Amino acid sequence: METQTVQQELESLPTTKMAQTNPMPGSVGPWKITIYDQENFQGKRMEFTSSCPNVSERNFDNVRSLKVECGAWVGYEHTSFCGQQFVLERGEYPRWDAWSGSNAYHIERLMSFRPICSANHKESKITIFEKENFIGRQWEICDDYPSLQAMGWPNNEVGSMKIQCGAWVCYQYPGYRGYQYILECDHHGGDYKHWREWGSHAQTSQIQSIRRIQQ
């Protein structure tokens, strides 16, 4: 298949109804991602520097490999930033299991994506709470934890969270496995009162590992 290279400038990309997920209008942030319609960086490709709510609008039926050249991104299983989430940090992803292999679920679709504007690995802080609405035991975290329970958290669930700065990815299971939840200080005012606010795919309050997202 003939390779087609298409470069899009920030102002030429489609706007999204979720305005808070985009960089400030007129700014060009440190974000760049290249997607391919075939595995191993083959086939048609396209570069983005801002959000894409639907790759099919760019004549892609799916994203089968990608390269993150600048910044941190989050990919979604479905269009309009819905479904399972996949954190995409700088590097190469030759096929779907490179971004969802640790997810423990077989998901080959990636239909939308956006930059994580608040990612700041050096200055990140989150407070987790035992119950919903910031009630119960609380724990302030500024580092990565492959197992919350091993570090003293009393159970395998988190009721609510406050993101003071940075962006975090929380995982359903220890060792950064299971469903991924991307939580950012510039979404919901940094306050996630209930596990249903973690994402459209959230089905449980189970969180057992957590780490900072690297910009």
Swiss-Prot record:
GO terms for biological process: lens development in camera-type eye; visual perception. Homo/heterodimer, or complexes of higher-order. The structure of beta-crystallin oligomers seems to be stabilized through interactions between the N-terminal arms. Interacts with CRYBA1. Residues 118-123 are annotated as: Connecting peptide. Specific cleavages in the N-terminal arm occur during lens maturation and give rise to several truncated forms. Isoform A1 contains a N-acetylalanine at position 2. Residues 1-30 are annotated as: N-terminal arm. It comes from the Eukaryota. Has a two-domain beta-structure, folded into four very similar Greek key motifs. The modification S-methylcysteine is found at residues 82, 117. The modification N-acetylmethionine is found at residue 1. Belongs to the beta/gamma-crystallin family. This is Beta-crystallin A3. Pfam families: Crystall. Coiled coil: none annotated. Crystallins are the dominant structural components of the vertebrate eye lens. PANTHER family: BETA-CRYSTALLIN A3, BETA/GAMMA CRYSTALLIN. The modification S-glutathionyl cysteine is found at residues 82, 117. InterPro entries: Beta/Gamma-Crystallin, Beta/gamma_crystallin, G_crystallin-like. Residues 1-24 are annotated as: Disordered. Gene3D superfamilies: Crystallins. Keywords: Acetylation, Eye lens protein, Glutathionylation, Methylation, Repeat. PROSITE patterns: CRYSTALLIN_BETA_GAMMA.
